[in-house]
Each structure stands twice: as structure tokens, then as C-alpha cells.
Amino acid sequence: METQKKRWGDRKDGRLMRELDSLHYVTGILYPNRCDNEAYISQRIDLTNMNAYIAKKNETETEFPYTMFHLVLAALMKTITLRPKLNRFIVNSNFYQRNEVSASFVVKKQFSDKGAEALAFLHCKDEYTLSDIHDYIRRQVTECRSDKVDPSTGAMDILNRIPRFVSKAAIHLLMWLDKHGWVPADIIATDPYYSSVVISNLGSIKLKCGYHHLTNWGTCSLFCIIGEKAVRPIYAPDGTMAMKETLDLGLTIDERLADGYYYSKSVRLLKHLLEHPEELEKPMKEEVIYE
């Protein structure tokens, strides 16, 4: 992303939007809480092309095979890069444009009731392609499944060990710092709610698609749920029907950031990328013709 000189009012993670139209300026003040402005979008993806694409990629990639999750994450990164309003956030009633495109997700160290979890965080660059995202996820998953504790989990572990009244006071202080963008970077280095998008792959644990709430903590304004894939009827424009394997996505957005048309066009881009996965081999910043 293009970097700009920091000005008064900017945060370390975002640039203050100084030329907003009056409607959006007032909206941020009238409706200050992110959780009060959640909206939900569902999208069904035809997996025909994606399944064939993944099978071909894995003919040569056997150590860490490509999966549907890798493609969804890469498609979200490209969509956010090309549709920058998705990468805005509102804190303290002010609109900000995030300085980078990022994603976060939880890695289960072991699939069991008592299996610990770790936080993975991906920083995307304009020149990244699907291959770069795949390698980045490989490194993150390997690190998360080791004995190493990620920075944000480490900070929470400390709060959990000290007396309860002290930890509550510390958390209230952090919430005040969060409002002004002053939370120490080490504490939120892997905090998922400071990313462009949080992704939860419910399909990996045999759950259908749903929606996840946003939070007033942090800056994340987009949450994506990946459901379990299933064979469902797909209707062509001429009315004919075929049974195909599909994937449902559930998106939770902050409706204050853009109008419905902008979100609609963004979701159509996401759908196009997932149903034409070869587009993900191009750099994130390269434009895509999709309508």
C-alpha cells in the first residue's frame, strides 16, 4: 500500500480520513460503537473450478498441500486491496484508513476438547500472490503449533496470573489506550481484532456457515466465516439446475464504512476470485475484470 507522511490525528495503524462527506462524518458520531452497526452478507461459492485448481496445485505441492482455506484467505486479501473502503475502521467516532492489509485466524494446536489455541497474523503486501500467502500460512501454522507462545496470548497469560482487581484495572486502562490508538504494539502484535479481517474456518470442525460478531475493542471491521462444503442445487440463468459442491461464506461488516452498492460489488469480486482461482496468481494490487 502507498505510504503517506504521518500527520496530527493519524494513528500508528491508520490515517485519519479528513475529507469525508457529511453523512459519514456525522454517522461516526451518532453511532460510535462498532457492534451496534453490524450487517450480515451471505455468499455461496461454486467449488467446481476451485476443486480442480487445488488438485492441480497439489500435484507438485505435497509437503503442505493447498486447501480451500488458503484460497479464501488470498481472495479476501486481494478483495480488500482492490476495495480499500473495506480496510477502514472507526474508533473514537473517527474514520481511519488502515496502513496495511492483514488477516488473522486461530490455529488449533490439537483437535481435541482440551487442545490449546494460538493466534496467527498475516501481513499482506501489494506484490503478494497466492503462492506467497500459502508460504506465509505454512510458516504461521508451524509456529503456532510449536511450544512458542504468541505475543498477544502471552500478554493475556500475564493478566490471568495477577490478582483479579489489578488485571481488571489494567484491562480498563488498555481499553482507554485502545480508544486513542496507544496500546503497546507488543501486546496487540497477534491480536486478531487489530487486523483487516478475521477468518474462522468452521467447516474444518464440521460446522455449517454462520456469522460472528464484531467487537468494539480493536479496529477489525470485517469477519468471515467459512462453512462446511456440501453438494447443493445450482441454478443457471436459463433455469436449468445441477447439483454441485458449494461453499457458504458468512460476512459480518461494519455498515458505516461504505454503502450497500460498494459492499455488493466487493462481494461479487470475492465470488469471482474464488470461482476463477487463477486470478489469485496475479499480484494483489493487479486489477481484475469481473463484471
Tell where the protein language model's regions lie, with residue ranges.
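C-terminal catalytic/motor cores of large multi-domain enzyme assemblies
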Residues: 1-291
